Every structure is written in C-alpha cells, then in structure tokens.
Amino acid sequence: MELHQWCRHIIVFLLNVWIPSCFAQTTPPARSSPTPTPQTADNPDSLKFRLSGFPRKHNEGRIEVFYKGEWGTICDDDFSLANAHVLCRQLGFVSATGWTHSAKYGKGAGKIWLDNVQCSGSERSVSVCKSRGWGNSDCTHDEDAGVICKDERLPGFVDSNVIEVQVDENRVEEVRLRPVFTTATKRMPVTEGVVEVKNKDGWAQICDIGWTPKNTHVVCGMMGFPHEKKVNKNFYKLYAERQKNFFLVHSVACLGTEVHLAACPLEFNYGNATESCPGGMPAVVSCVPGPLYTQSPTMKKKLKMPPTTRLKGGAKYGEGRVEVLKGSEWGTVCDDRWNLVSASVVCREMGFGSAKEALTGASMGKGLGPIHMNEVQCTGNERSLWSCRYKNITAEDCKHTEDASVRCNVPYMGYEKTVRILGGRTRYEGRVEVLHREADGTLRWGLICGEGWGTQEAMVLCRQLGLGYANHGLQVRLSGGRSPYEGRVEVRVGQRWGSVCSEGWSTKEAMVLCRQLGLGFSMHAITETWYWDSSNVTDMVMSGVKCTGDEMSISQCQHHRTVNCQKAAARFAAGVICSETASDLVLNAPLVQQTTYIEDRPLHMLYCAAEEDCLSKSAASANWPYGHRRLLRFSSQIHNIGRADFRPKAGRHSWVWHACHGHYHSMDIFTHYDLMSANGTKVAEGHKASFCLEDTDCDEGVSKRYKCANFGEQGITVGCWDLYRHDIDCQWIDITDVKPGNYILQVVINPNYEVSESDFTNNAMKCNCKYDGHRIWVHNCHIGDAFSEEAEKKFEKYPGQLNNQIS
C-alpha cells in the first residue's frame, strides 16, 4: 500500500511539471515575417571574417563568416550601415563608409549564415546583433551583402585570420598585357603579350603549364576584348629563354565565365619564383578587339550589322543603360537579379570586354517605352542576352526606375594623355590644350581656336578626358580651370603645348574632349577663356575643329591642316566645363498624336502671334483683321529623364521679356516644329520665337524647382516635364499655304545642341500625316530611335486613321 501511494505521488509530481511546460511553449514566428532575436555564437571571438568577391579593393567586398567549420555569407535583408560598422571593426578597420546589396561583388557559395541582421552599431560582434539565427535564412546568394570599410586599421589589431584570407586576391587586383614586339609597344590597343599580375614587389608572370583558352578568355575580357585567338608560342618561347622571369602564379583554372582573374582558382608560388615553372614559360595571350577598336575590314562590317542590343545614356564608350530590340521596338531590361555575369554577356555582345559593374536603379537614366526582359539569368557563355533565361515583363513587375545598366572593360587607348584642360576652377573645366607632332617629329602643346566651338565639340573633348560627355598621337589637356573638370583646352605639337581656336567650338566638340579625358559630359563649350589663369601656352596650334559628337578622340574630328583662326588672341582659346551627369530631354509622342487638330483662327485674334513672328510669311500680305490662318495645333510635353537638370545656356541677364506672355523667355530656339514631305523637304514650320522653361508637373516624390513666372530660375528638373498646351499662343504650325498630301510632322528638341544632353538621338519625334485640305490624319508618332532601322524605313507606308476635323 505504501509503495502504491508512493508511485501515485511520483506521477502527480511529473504531471505538475510536464503539463505547464507544454502550455508555456509558443508558436515559432512565420518565415515571411521573422522576429529577429540576439543570436550569440558559442564564442564570438572564435568567428572569422573575410572580404571576398571581385572586382574590389582590399577594404571592400562580399562579407563572409567562418562558423562551425564552414565559410558562409550574410543576406542583405534589413542590412544597414550600422551592421557594416560592426563587421568592419571585426575585420580590423576603424569603421564603414558604405555597404552593398544584391551580390555586387559576385555571388558567394555554401551557407548563408545570417539573415535580417539588425545591429545598433556599437556591438563588439555581429553575433550579438538581432537576426533570424545562425543558418536560418530564406535568401539566395543573389542577395549577398557586402561592406566598404574605411581604409584605416584599428590600432593594435592583430587578427591574422583577416590578413591571411586576403593575401591571394590582393595579388591579382591588377593585370596587364606586356607586348614583346617593338612595333606592338607603339600600337594601341595592345592585343597580344605576356600576362603579368601585380603584387607588392612589382609585376610578375604566370606559369603557362595547364594554361587553357578559358583563362585567355577571362584575361582578354579584363583587357576590354570580346574574343581571343591562338598565339604563336614558338616566338615567345625563344624570348622567354633570354629573360629572367618571376613566376608569382603557378596555376590558373578559370571556367571562362569569370569577369576577373581573381575569381579563378589560383595557386601561388612561395618558393624560388624564378625557377618554379619547369618546362613552361610565361603565359601569353592574343585577343581580338571589337569593331570599334580594329582596322580589320571583317570586324568593321559588324558595325554595320543591325544590332539587337545597345547602350544608352553613358558618358563613355562601353557604359550605358541596356536596351534590347524586340519586334522592331527597343526596350529596357529590369534590374531584378541583374549581375556581372549577365552584364558581361551584354558587354561582349557590344564588342567590349567583360563587365566592370552591373548597375541597377536606372543609374544611367530612365528609358522609354516597353521593358522587354526581367530576371535575366545568364551562364556567361551566351553570345546574346536573348539567349539567356529571362521572364517576360508584366505591368506590376518593373518600372523604368529599375532599368539595368553596365560599365564594361574597354581597351586602353591612351587618349586621355593627348589632351588637357587648364585654368578651370575644378578638374572638370578649363582651357583646351592639345599635344601635336610637328613635321620634324617633335611634340608640342598648343591651343585650339575657339571660333565656332560649341557644345558638341566640348562633349567630344570631355569624353576624351574621361570627364563624361561633352587621333591617338594628338595629346590634349585642360589648363587653368578651378577644378580638374574645367579649363582651357591645350594640344601638344612637338614638344610645345598650344591652344585651340574657339571659332566653331560647340557642344559636339566639347563632348568628345570630355569623353577623351574621362571627365564625363560637357556642361559648357567656352569660346573665351581670358579669365582662366594661363599656363605658359601662348600659341594657337589647332583651328576649324568639327566633330560629329561620337568620336573617341579630338584627333578623329575634322580640323584645318594649317591654323586659320580669325581671333588668334589667347583670350579666344577654346575651353570646356565637364560634368559627370547630364540632362536627357524626350517628347511625349502619344500626347502629340492625341492632341493634334486643325483650327481656322481669325486674324483679329492673332495680333500677338504676329508680333512674335509665329505665322508664315504670307500672313504679312493678308487682309488684316479679316480672314483667318489655318493652324496645325498640338500639345508638346517635354520630359527630363536624365541625371541632371536641364538649364538654359544663357544667364538671366540676357533673357528677353515678352509682354504678350507676361514672362521672360530664356531660350530663343528650344524646339523646331516642321511639316515635311515624304522625301524630307520642309513645307511648313513653326515660328515660335522663344521659350520659357518650367516644371509643369513631376513624378511622384519629385518637387518642382523652376517656374516661368516673374524672374525666377528656369529649367526642367530631373523627373519633371514642361507642358506647352495646344491652346497657347504659337504652339502650332501655320499650314495655310500647304496643299493636300502625305506629310511627316517632326518635332526636334534642343535642335542646335545649345545645352549638353546624355543622349541626343531621342530628341526628334516623327508622325505620319495625311491632309486632304479639310481634315488631317496623324498616326504612328514615335521618338526617332524607338524602332529598328528596318521599321524606320517603312515609316511612310503605314496606313492612318481619322484623327480630327477642322474646328
């Protein structure tokens, strides 16, 4: 009995313990909405961290954590600068300057150790920050986070784990081709040579034992070349036997889809590097340049082939917003899952090398029209982006704020060494100087005559300098500017620098110059540079410069064989101001088609228009105030989809007051309205004398900045548009004298290139018109570069529909 009673007490005790514990258990949080909690590793000090990925510097990269014997990544969900601060300190840096998402440094492999990490920034270790917990994640490696640390080490930091995991990748951050032939050293670009990698002791070679075409493919891509070819190793073998080589890398095993040699499996030499390639020699590659960089007739023919992919809105060759052709219509690519592998397919398809950057968020400006592709996933072996896996777009998937862009590796041409700008306030502006070779072979710098120097010339020069928008042997520089982006243009002739005559110097020339110097776009083409402090350059060595705006270098533009400058004084030397960003104006074509109509307007209502000279010449002989004029009216809505505000070239002091309109006009010629015959002959034109520029309305979240009223600032803000309604004065073409027939309505924005833009090819809009003397049919309105060349040729043949009647 006592035993039975004792057992009963035991059972009651166990039930009292077990039942409350069951009811105390809670349901775990749903996967889609985690509740981060602090997750502490067994020993936070035992965690190891490293920076990986490519291309990158030593203080940035994909963050990886070594936990429970395995390296893994961190998901970018809820990632912040505070997280980056904690991680950078654990890596031995004083703090973070930024962080990256969407696997900017490439996708990692293996585990994703942490997700939804939320640090305050003061934690000693990321392991004590809130998160889902170790190994608990709903991410893919497309979402790997990266950090950018301040390049300053913590005093006394001695964690060898961090240093050791960075050593190998740091050694191959720079790669070059060293040409061996004497003639090859003078020819640009260098397409063949010994592969060398840079380390702390200088440049070293790679042993070619086991070297494969896939390795060559990766190296050529880094050098800016889309393809490779076999190389004659016999010559190089003889050369190598006479040289003392230093072999840093013993073995390379690329897959061929990598964008950087650092991403390939590498074996390094740690012994006697001069004798560590028995039976081998330095690796040698031979690359095939794209059509833009070759003299080969076969490759040049490829330039004339209709493209299916193009880059728009970039300041330099090899960068821009990705656009693809589908059903004769150009459209953009959504940036979902956009990465370096897919970007490299685009770059090689365009005739460049592998991708340096896969940019998201409309980094090169927003596109127009349809978005053709979403979630593009390439393997890296495709010849065209259309060969990659992708999803068709739906209205809910993407907007043009998510347009994908690329920056490609391009061949080094040395153009930026042949031009300079001096005297400007920044490196983006200055007087233009060029380096020129005289008849005796000597080199000297000189000025460029500023007569006719305009925005187009300046855009060419800014691209040459690498400063953005605005022949190899002609050296150019900017002199005297307030910054590296401005200055007087100077060229070198023999051993002497000289200036450029500013007669004819315009936006197109400045575009090329800024591009050549790598300074972006041209903001202004300057024709008088007396206010910029001069270098010792006094000679004018170049005049008559005329560019199309597409050249890589100012030497590829037309110019006088001998200097012929009417204004040869130094004050008239050409100059530029370059900028990293530019505006991009485009007309709302559907709105033109929807609002076009004919009005017979009585002359007594057109006195103000006559004062503005908005009627055709025959109006002067009309029987005023009796009779009427027949007007083709329409609305024009001009959007700025670029990356900088569109501002009038003229300062406020030169704006003109228009009493009829009650405000100032800041631009004499802002748009051209033309009615043309099918063969392009102009039969009537708009006579709008001048324009004011303002923000009529803007995209959601964008504030208006410019207004025509009073004497305020004028312009068009990025993300805003200027609307000229069909019912305002002079918003028409006077077609009183036009006979019935088939015509083309054309509207061109910024026709004289007075203001720099990132893309001038989308400034023209065309419509088909059929006029029977009483009614007009307007159809097929589109931006000039919206369709393929083949579709554009069929432009006049499309049938129209009745659009309106005379009002």
Curated annotation (Swiss-Prot):
Which positions are glycosylated? N272, N392, N536, N679
Q: Which reaction does it catalyse?
A: L-lysyl-[protein] + O2 + H2O = (S)-2-amino-6-oxohexanoyl-[protein] + H2O2 + NH4(+); N(6)-acetyl-L-lysyl-[protein] + O2 + H2O = acetamide + (S)-2-amino-6-oxohexanoyl-[protein] + H2O2
PTM remark: The lysine tyrosylquinone cross-link (LTQ) is generated by condensation of the epsilon-amino group of a lysine with a topaquinone produced by oxidation of tyrosine.
The record lists its disulfide bonds as C75-C139, C88-C149, C119-C129, C207-C277, C220-C287, C254-C264, C334-C398, C347-C408, C378-C388, C514-C578, C547-C557
Looking up PROSITE patterns in the UniProt record yields: LYSYL_OXIDASE, SRCR_1, SRCR_2
Q: Does the keyword Oxidoreductase apply?
A: yes
Its GO CC terms are:
collagen-containing extracellular matrix; cytoplasm; extracellular space; membrane; nucleus
The UniProt keywords, alphabetically, are: Copper, Cytoplasm, Disulfide bond, Glycoprotein, LTQ, Metal-binding, Nucleus, Oxidoreductase, Repeat, Secreted, Signal, TPQ
User: What does the record give as the function of this protein?
Assistant: Protein-lysine 6-oxidase that mediates the oxidation of peptidyl lysine residues to allysine in target proteins. Catalyzes the post-translational oxidative deamination of peptidyl lysine residues in precursors of elastin and different types of collagens, a prerequisite in the formation of cross-links between collagens and elastin. Can mediate oxidation of lysine residues that are acetylated. Also able to catalyze deacetylation of lysine residues. Required for maturation of neural crest derived cartilage elements.
**One example GO MF annotation:** fibronectin binding
One matching Pfam family is SRCR
Describe the location of the SRCR domain by residue ranges: 49-150, 175-288, 309-409, 419-470, 476-579
EC number(s) reported in the record = 1.4.3.-, 1.4.3.13
* Source domain of life: Eukaryota
Q: Cofactors per UniProt?
A: Cu cation; lysine tyrosylquinone residue
Asked whether the keyword Metal-binding is assigned, the reply is yes
Q: Which residues carry this modification: 2',4',5'-topaquinone?
A: Y724
This chain belongs to which protein, by name? Lysyl oxidase homolog 3B
User: GO annotations under biological process?
Assistant: collagen fibril organization; embryonic viscerocranium morphogenesis; fibronectin fibril organization; inflammatory response; lung development; negative regulation of T-helper 17 cell lineage commitment; peptidyl-lysine oxidation; positive regulation of integrin-mediated signaling pathway
Q: What happens when the gene is disrupted?
A: Craniofacial defects. Cartilage elements embryos do not mature and chondrocyte morphology and extracellular matrix are affected.
Give cross-link positions for Lysine tyrosylquinone (Lys-Tyr): K688-Y724
| Cofactor details (free text) | Contains 1 lysine tyrosylquinone.
Gene3D superfamilies attached to this UniProt entry: SRCR-like domain
Family per UniProt?
Belongs to the lysyl oxidase family.
Give the location in the cell.
Secreted, Extracellular space; Cytoplasm; Nucleus
